[in-house]
Amino acid sequence: MDFSKITNNKYVDYFLSVDESSINNEIMNEFLNKMIEASKSLDKDNTIPPTEIVKEIKSRLGLDGSVYGVITQIASSDLINCLSSLEIFTLLWFVSCKNAFCFEEGVYYNMTINKTIGNLLKKLSSCQ
């Protein structure tokens, strides 16, 4: 398995070490800002209802929802070569996020995040 693309990164390190009772908002906000910036050029109409996002990702990847499971799945399949680092981080974020933070207004309903996920889901279909 080739983990080189997703190890040695502070976002991935954070996802792997996150405690159930705490969220480092500074790291998350920095991550979200990078994701939002990168998604600005995506199709404005490419949105998915927020409540379907996590369910759809887990369904397509057959995951148990754990971050370790996500990383293992990505690294042991063609996804490692098909997804960009941003898309990998996006996938990790939505599978590992905690509800209190995910549903925060301005984060959960941000359309640029939905566009990033829409693009990712299309790519997941063509990867497998």
Feature locations, PLM:
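Short, extreme N-terminal segment that most often corresponds to the first beta-strand
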Residues: 1-22
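Short amphipathic alpha-helical heptad-repeat segments
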Residues: 4, 80-99
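Long alpha-helical scaffold regions
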Residues: 8, 17-19, 27-36
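Intrinsically disordered, low-complexity coil/linker segments enriched for acidic/polar
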Residues: 9, 24-25, 84-87
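Charged, low-complexity interaction regions
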Residues: 20-27, 41-48, 79-81, 100-111
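Repeat-associated, polar segments at repeat-unit boundaries in modular proteins
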Residues: 44, 48-65, 113-124
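Amphipathic alpha-helical binding modules
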Residues: 93-128
